[in-house]
Amino acid sequence: MADLKVSVVSADNEVWSGLAKQIVARTTEGEIGILPGHEPLLAILAAGEVRVTTLEGAVVTANAADGFLSVEHNTVTIVARNAELVK
């Protein structure tokens, strides 16, 4: 199975990047799950959590608002005006 190359960035810095096996994010259409092989997608983020499951199975959580999520060729880019890792 392929991996997802993920970048989560805010307006002023990169919040997290790496390889993942799953992404779950809240969009204006509802919560969406992204797995390797997902069709191309551009979605508007709603305020809420973005959960990234790494290849090792760890879950990285970030709060994100005011942005978008892009999926193309197993590359997921999440750009938000406000984004920060949840400790």
Region annotations inferred by a language model:
Residues 5-87:
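Compact, glycine-rich, soluble single-domain proteins
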